[in-house]
Regions:
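Sec-dependent N-terminal signal peptides
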Residues: 4-13
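Solvent-exposed loop/turn segments at secondary-structure junctions
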Residues: 20-24, 69-73, 103-107
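Post-signal peptide N-terminal segment of mature Sec-exported envelope proteins
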Residues: 26-46
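Short, well-ordered alpha-helical segments
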Residues: 62-102
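Short acidic, glycine/proline-enriched helix-loop-strand junctions
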Residues: 76, 104-123
């Protein structure tokens, strides 16, 4: 019985969080996270980049992520926010994210959101 209650609590938690993280295709089409699950390149460390020049490996762009998920202070210091962002990134098969601070050309751009580019390293 306890497992059943815990299972439903997790479902409710993830369904509430999913609406705060929106995935878009490269073409700007809104995507469902359930449809995005793919395997990663085998690199197990999640990495957040603040500049494309920091990336040493070749990569391809998978998707874009937009979020209005609440965070304390600067988002990269908020452990809960970063944990959710990491889980979403790895779930979609990406190896890393690029924080897109100054890009306003994302689909349905909203200044209240943070935007990221999800990338996958080439093997």
């Amino acid at each position: 019985m306890i497992r059943l209650v815990l299972y439903f609590c997790l479902i409710i938690l993830f369904s509430c969080v999913d609406k705060h993280f929106i995935a878009y295709s490269i073409d700007g089409e809104k995507l469902n996270y359930e449809d995005l699950h793919t395997s990663s390149s085998g690199i197990s460390d999640f990495k957040l980049f603040f500049n494309k020049d920091e990336i040493d490996l070749e990569y391809t762009i998978l998707h874009f992520i937009a979020t209005d998920y609440y965070y304390y202070g600067q988002f990269f210091f908020d452990k809960n926010f970063m944990s959710m962002l990491k889980n979403k990134t790895l779930h979609m098969g990406a190896d890393a994210l690029i924080y897109e601070k100054d890009r306003t050309d994302f689909p349905n751009y909203n200044e209240n959101y943070l935007y990221f580019t999800a990338i996958k390293y080439k093997n």
